[in-house]
């Protein structure tokens, strides 16, 4: 079992979307979580709406602080927060430079969701089982 953390600044859009896709594509043995370095306290309503239209209900997700993460992280994926993301201990770190969609128009927001979907799917497909 691997613990995979998706990390962004507010844990309201990108990391929430990535968590949902990873849970959909990954085997249940993996623990998939997301958090933010400065959480907003809520999941972005546009993210909830658009993910719902794509068949992924994230309305029950919550915006969490990275300080709440107690698990040992096997793989940390930063969603593009650069220096704003804390240097957490992880066996492997990946940096995905995903634009923050929170102020984008819906059609642009959808393109970011599709980008995250594509990256997560490829990541999960190439994830070793052990």
For each feature predicted by the language model, list its residue ranges:
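Mid-chain, well-packed structural core segment of small domains
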Residues: 61, 66-89
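Conserved active-site segments centered on acidic
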Residues: 1-67
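Hydrophobic/aromatic beta-strand patches that form the interior of the parallel beta-sheet core
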Residues: 33, 75-77, 94-96
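Alpha-helix boundary/capping detector
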Residues: 48, 76-78, 119
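Phosphate-binding/catalytic loops
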Residues: 82-130
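Surface-exposed loop/turn and secondary-structure junction residues enriched for glycine/proline
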Residues: 20, 24, 69-72, 91, ...
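Short conserved AdoMet
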Residues: 27, 71, 128
């Amino acid at each position: 079992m691997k613990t995979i953390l998706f990390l962004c600044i507010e844990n309201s859009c990108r990391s929430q979307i990535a968590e949902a896709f990873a849970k959909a594509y990954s085997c249940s043995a993996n623990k998939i979580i997301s958090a933010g370095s400065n959480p907003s306290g809520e999941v972005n309503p546009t993210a909830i709406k658009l993910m719902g239209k794509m068949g992924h209900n994230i309305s029950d997700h919550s915006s969490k602080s990275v300080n709440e993460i107690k698990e040992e992280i096997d793989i940390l994926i930063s969603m593009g927060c650069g220096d704003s993301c804390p240097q957490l201990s992880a066996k492997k770190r990946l940096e995905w430079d995903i634009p923050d969609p929170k102020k984008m128009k819906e059609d642009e927001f959808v393109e970011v969701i599709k980008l995250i979907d594509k990256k997560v799917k490829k990541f999960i497909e190439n994830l070793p089982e052990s």
